Amino acid sequence: MHILVVGVDYKSAPIEIREKVSFQPNELAEAMVQLKEEKSILENIIVSTCNRTEIYAVVDQLHTGRYYIKKFLADWFQLSKEELSPFLTFYESDAAVEHLFRVACGLDSMVIGETQILGQVRDSFKTAQQEKTIGTIFNELFKQAVTVGKRTHAETDIGSNAVSVSYAAVELAKKIFGNLSSKHILILGAGKMGELAAENLHGQGIGKVTVINRTYLKAKELADRFSGEARSLNQLESALAEADILISSTGASEFVVSKEMMENANKLRKGRPLFMVDIAVPRDLDPALNDLEGVFLYDIDDLEGIVEANMKERRETAEKVELLIEETIVEFKQWMNTLGVVPVISALREKALAIQSETMDSIERKLPHLSTREKKLLNKHTKSIINQMLRDPILKVKELAADADSEEKLALFMQIFDIEEAAGRQMMKTVESSQKVHSFKKAESKAGFSPLVSE
């Protein structure tokens, strides 16, 4: 079995691609369930945010896993593999584990140390648990990822003066307007990104806040928290005529503000400039808005400069986080090694108990007049002998699992005791047990036995 990550992120793909390869929150459960039916996929979790869409999977073979995940993404988003492939990133085995931990800690984010991604990883983990698309390996891996993410923010200063993409949007507004106390801010979208933008703006002492959302009650809840005004979506055009700054993050599948709508709003603006920041993926604001006089449009990719300026101190703190990640990688590898040893120990016990059972059958045939009590006594003592004989080999095989060359040593151990085939069967049982609802018949069988995730 192997751990594999396939996806796109802000480093590998421009926003035009990321918005095409983005799962809506209400699609994640269905997507994970559908993906688990693909050949080679044993466990899977999908993490999809404005800056990344990544599939984490346990696969039986790396090459088939890569193929079927690429096929799944292309089919789901109705893209050709040729369109998608140049932007995909791949992480395998140890690199995949390290990548997940870096993501959970915020080290792989556009804004280093941001906390929002940890919540998104945790939410995807919960969804996968509910939909039963994960088993033994990812239950442990993602628990450790969430734990190291929490430790990062508890034990280091990387989250101090917390920033995010929405914070960067506010910073950009400050650079353009200076003091925001007299400005009218329009927030389009009352989701998490809109909420973060409102929080950051509130900290800057803004003049007036208006919140618009498809669901009016949700807009009102957010507006009330910051003494603002809520409006319905059909009032968007009039709100655009009044605002100085627009921050948009609805997550809609099509443009919410069109060029035509803004042209109508501009007639009432009397030449006043409008600063617009689109932090949604897919984008909310038509790029053609940039052609209009007095409109200054920025999208999520334009925020990189602001983000970079705020990150120097966090990069220094990131070195401490790297140490936490290294510790957690070691812990996970030790756990994986122990997991790999379980089938070996089970196979050894199985063989020893089979010998004990055959011996008891032979004794009972040769001594037919043994009483039930005598048979039970013999059975108990022969099993005791077996357990005593197995004690040292089992302790030794557990020690071998911690060695750097454990895979080769375990293979030799199995060869000495002639239990390769039995260990392979035990590993199959482990996989099937961890995949309670996954039909293992769909995965290609793999000859031999590999107790570890390959290096």
UniProtKB/Swiss-Prot annotation:
Give the enzyme class.
oxidoreductase
InterPro entries, per this entry?
4pyrrol_synth_GluRdtase (IPR000343), 4pyrrol_synth_GluRdtase_dimer (IPR015896), 4pyrrol_synth_GluRdtase_N (IPR015895), GluRdtase_CS (IPR018214), GluRdtase_dimer_dom_sf (IPR036453), GluRdtase_N_sf (IPR036343), NAD(P)-bd_dom_sf (IPR036291), Shikm_DH/Glu-tRNA_Rdtase (IPR006151)
The UniProt entry's sequence similarity note says: Belongs to the glutamyl-tRNA reductase family.
- Domain of life, per UniProt, equals Bacteria
Which protein are we looking at?
Glutamyl-tRNA reductase
List the signal peptide residues: none
Q: Which SUPFAM superfamilies match?
A: Glutamyl tRNA-reductase catalytic, N-terminal domain (SSF69742), Glutamyl tRNA-reductase dimerization domain (SSF69075), NAD(P)-binding Rossmann-fold domains (SSF51735)
Sorted alphabetically, which keywords does the UniProt record give? NADP, Oxidoreductase, Porphyrin biosynthesis
Pathway given for this chain reads: Porphyrin-containing compound metabolism; protoporphyrin-IX biosynthesis; 5-aminolevulinate from L-glutamyl-tRNA(Glu): step 1/2
The organism named in the record is Bacillus subtilis (strain 168)
Q: Does the keyword Ribosomal protein apply?
A: no
Positions marked as site (Important for activity)? H99
Domain remarks: Possesses an unusual extended V-shaped dimeric structure with each monomer consisting of three distinct domains arranged along a curved 'spinal' alpha-helix. The N-terminal catalytic domain specifically recognizes the glutamate moiety of the substrate. The second domain is the NADPH-binding domain, and the third C-terminal domain is responsible for dimerization.
A Pfam family the protein falls into: Shikimate_DH
